[in-house]
């Protein structure tokens, strides 16, 4: 178990943030230990669509992290199959206002040398005949974007690092204490093991109550509960990431459009937005379709107030809206689930350095799959500059 060994970097948390911190540090020749409390990580990094869509991120900040992440994903895919598929993203407008936003968004992307193409309603339907004619006003296609399988991507990257980059990894290894001692970080596990690191990164997701809880201000963090579902395998018809009208109204990039502040919201849209619902589709290799999602929020530290139920009302609202958008072979629901992630309220990610050697990276919210590789690349670069 390498007990008492000192590493350049110890990382607590095997999700996407921890995994890519390890990846970038190893690429810089650092010795890295990755500790995971469970048999394998299974939280927000895995309970998502697996869409890498920089197009939805706030322009001139997280949009750039998303573009960098896409390159990292594609470069890594050339070395090992981490499930990246360059299939592009479709935004589908449901009314004239959303179509105006797509037109403005295309120009904003052009200004940033990010390829996109606008399609009329008839062109969109010709390429995507499963969309319903009465829903579609037009579409915007971004060819460079990609999808991944969230159930396998992080695991495959970790195995690649173990086999090829010298990563040391321990699962079933809950960390119960982190402190600075003798000028470096001392990490203690529930099995009474001690590890040492010149630096330690805490990337432990929504579990903020165990390690240094006093450094997670509840006023700056909230927890989101989302609901998603998987429809039964069926004929392959969705060739790209599919993002719809409510997504156009929700995603940060569109807030940069000149007309965004002027759009009208109907009472039906407001009912869905009250549950944080916008509709995304992604079809997996086995033909199953991931559909969602919704968003509810509580302050950090109050996640028990969510309860443990998956709301059938929310699922029915999502299915009803999805059926307005597209025709499918069947709408049989194979499984439903809830996901939880920590999100900053005053910043797009929560970072803090404690005693010069302990680094907290958390609260990246729902943009982890799209932006984590790029964001962690910059963080590790600064750490070792």
Feature-to-residue mapping (PLM):
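Helical element adjacent to the flavin cofactor pocket in flavoenzyme catalytic cores
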Residues: 141-185, 189-191, 195-199
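Dinucleotide-binding Rossmann-like beta1-alpha1 core, especially the glycine-rich loop
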Residues: 49-127
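Short beta-strand to alpha-helix junction loop
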Residues: 64-65, 92-101, 140-159, 309-314, ...
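Helix-loop-beta segment of a Rossmann-like dinucleotide-binding subdomain
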Residues: 81-91, 125-165, 356-357, 362
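Flavin-dependent oxidoreductases
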Residues: 178-183, 193-283, 304
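Glycine-rich FAD pyrophosphate-binding loop
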Residues: 27-46
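Beta1/beta-strand and adjacent pyrophosphate-binding region of the FAD-binding site
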Residues: 2-15
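C-terminal catalytic lobe of FAD-dependent flavoproteins
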Residues: 276, 285-290, 296-385
């Amino acid at each position: 178990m390498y007990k008492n060994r000192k590493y350049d970097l110890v990382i607590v948390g095997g999700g996407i943030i921890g995994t890519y911190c390890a990846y970038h540090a190893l690429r810089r020749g650092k010795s890295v230990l990755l500790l995971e409390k469970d048999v394998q990580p299974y939280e927000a990094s895995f309970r998502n669509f697996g869409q890498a869509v920089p197009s939805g991120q706030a322009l001139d900040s997280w949009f750039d992290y998303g573009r960098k992440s896409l390159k990292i994903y594609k470069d890594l895919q050339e070395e090992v199959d981490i499930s990246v598929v360059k299939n592009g993203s479709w935004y589908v407008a449901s009314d004239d206002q959303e179509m105006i936003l797509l037109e403005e968004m295309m120009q904003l992307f052009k200004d940033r040398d990010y390829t996109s193409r606008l399609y009329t309603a008839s062109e969109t339907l010709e390429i995507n005949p499963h969309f319903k004619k009465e829903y579609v006003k037009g579409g915007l296609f971004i060819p460079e974007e990609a999808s991944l399988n969230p159930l396998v991507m992080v695991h495959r990257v970790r195995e690649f690092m173990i086999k090829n980059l010298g990563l040391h990894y321990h699962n079933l290894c809950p960390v119960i204490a982190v402190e600075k001692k003798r000028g470096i970080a001392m990490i203690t596990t529930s099995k009474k093991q001690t590890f040492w690191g010149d630096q330690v990164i805490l990337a432990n997701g929504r579990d903020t109550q165990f390690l240094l809880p006093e450094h997670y201000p509840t006023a700056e963090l909230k927890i989101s509960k989302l609901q998603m579902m998987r429809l039964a395998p069926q004929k392959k018809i969705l060739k790209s990431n599919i993002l719809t009208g409510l997504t156009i109204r929700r995603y940060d990039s569109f807030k940069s459009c000149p007309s965004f502040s002027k759009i009208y919201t109907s009472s039906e849209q407001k009912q869905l937005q009250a549950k944080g619902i916008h509709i995304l589709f992604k079809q997996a290799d086995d033909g199953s379709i991931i559909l969602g999602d919704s968003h509810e929020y509580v302050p950090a530290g109050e996640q028990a107030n969510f309860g443990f139920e998956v709301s059938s009302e929310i699922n029915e609202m999502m299915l009803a809206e999805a059926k307005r958008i597209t025709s499918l072979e069947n709408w049989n629901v194979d499984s439903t689930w809830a996901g939880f992630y920590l999100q900053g309220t005053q910043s797009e990610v929560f970072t803090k350095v404690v005693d010069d050697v302990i680094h907290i990276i958390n609260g990246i919210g729902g943009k982890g799959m799209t932006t984590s590789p790029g964001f962690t690349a910059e963080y590790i670069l600064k750490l070792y500059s």
